Regions:
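N-terminal Rossmann-like NAD(P) cofactor-binding subdomain of oxidoreductases
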Residues: 2-196, 200-203
Length: 203
């Protein structure tokens, strides 16, 4: 029986989340059912290669990583790299992707999502929460409400890291004892834009 073709994914943004996606899919191999075929990021090719190869948290990448022209080769996969500062600068349709995974954190409104769709992206999954629930067709925490997806959604958010950590526990508590109101305090790991010395910062 022929195997179904992998779901083709393009990453817009190759920071922490984008690189973790690539690593996770490569570690799972063909059984993941997904293949990253394109990356759009402003960094130069040498930096993309280095940051793929070395990770302070997860260690060295367990495979081959090399650059050839405008392609990042990871094991036996060839990933097309573009450096457009806007969604409109990438030919998503020409890349024949099934999904754009928006990992830059820059875009969080329905208007932003429409820019990807107008540029040829068939669907967009945002790795961050949106500005409001009106800005997305669905917000999904996997293991909690993914069954509500109909397949007609074009703009979906994977919520925030805090939401993904807290909601499964809150669901268990709600089922066991019932919850009316909750307050959550998050101790968050350092972000890539936070200085380690005293400096101005929006948060």
């Amino acid at each position: 029986m022929p195997q179904p073709r992998p779901y083709k994914v393009a990453l817009n943004g190759y920071g922490r989340i984008g690189r973790c996606v690539v690593r996770a899919l490569c570690e799972r191999g063909a059984k993941a059912g997904f293949e990253v075929v394109a990356i759009n990021d402003l960094a130069d090719m040498a930096s993309l290669e280095y940051l793929t190869r070395f990770d302070s948290t997860h260690g060295r990448f367990p495979g081959e990583v090399r650059v050839e022209g405008q392609y990042l080769h990871i094991n036996d996969h060839r990933i097309k790299v573009s450096r457009s500062p806007t969604p409109e600068g990438v030919d998503w349709a020409g890349l024949e992707v099934d999904l754009v995974l928006e990992c830059s954190g820059v875009y969080n409104t329905r208007e932003d999502g429409q820019r990807f769709l107008d540029a040829g992206a068939p669907r967009v999954l945002f790795s961050q929460p949106m500005a409001s629930e009106r800005d997305v067709d669905a917000t999904v925490v996997f293991g909690i409400n993914q069954h509500r997806l109909t397949g007609r959604e074009l703009l979906v958010s994977a919520a925030s890291c805090t939401t993904n950590c807290s909601v499964p526990l809150l669901r268990l508590l709600d089922q066991a004892i019932g919850l009316e109101y909750i307050t959550i305090t998050t101790i968050h790991s350092a972000m890539n834009d936070q200085p380690v010395i005293d400096a101005y910062h929006h948060e």
